[in-house]
Amino acid sequence: IIIDGTENFSTRYLTNDAAVILGKPYIYGSIFRFEGQVSVFLSKPFNGFDRGPCYRCLFPAPPPPGAVPSCAEGGVLGVLPGIIGALQTAEAIKLIVGISEPLIGKMMLIDTLRMEFRTVKIQRNPNCPVCGENPTIQELIDYEEFCGLRRGEVSESDDIFISPHELKAKLDAREPIMLLDVREPR
């Protein structure tokens, strides 16, 4: 079972395609600001559960680079990763034990501002290039290129971080640096 907590589109497509190729359940979780999503993508029957759509059935193509802000740029309600992670864990337990109804063919949408949880149905795409009737993607591809990034390129939404130890080393070496502190004043 693959449980995904990434916020990087190229990694999500890689994870999905690997899960489909290997026949593994893929438990997807996504967060942004006050909202989250959870689903179970299952390309082959597993422990008594029928197959359902994959991530590409729902999102056939990634958004253009920089079109979707990162969690660091848009912010995230502090408890939301824990909520989504707990729901993903519950889905994993249901798959392992073979009980209840996992979110196969469904996506749970969480809005913590309104404190609303709703579930929507999602369909398998028979023309999906990975899990469809005649798949055209049967091995892993260059996901950075697929998502519009050149190999090794940092997208506009990626953040550059430096640890306190790295900063001290640069200051001690008198390297010319520019440090911008974007923390909120207290």
Regions from the language model: what does each represent?
Residues 17, 94, 186:
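Surface-exposed charge patches
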Residues 114-186:
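Flexible, polar/low-complexity N-terminal or interdomain linker segments that lie immediately upstream
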Residues 5-8, 92, 182:
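Generic detector of well-ordered alpha-helical packing
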Residues 25, 34-36, 103, 173-176:
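Short, basic and Ser/Thr-rich N-terminal targeting/leader segments
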Residues 1-84, 97, 114-116, 121-126, ...:
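E1/E1-like adenylate-forming module used to activate ubiquitin-like modifiers
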Residues 104-115:
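Intrinsically disordered, low-complexity Ser/Thr-enriched
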Residues 85-103:
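Internal hydrophobic alpha-helix adjacent to the cofactor/substrate pocket in enzyme cavities
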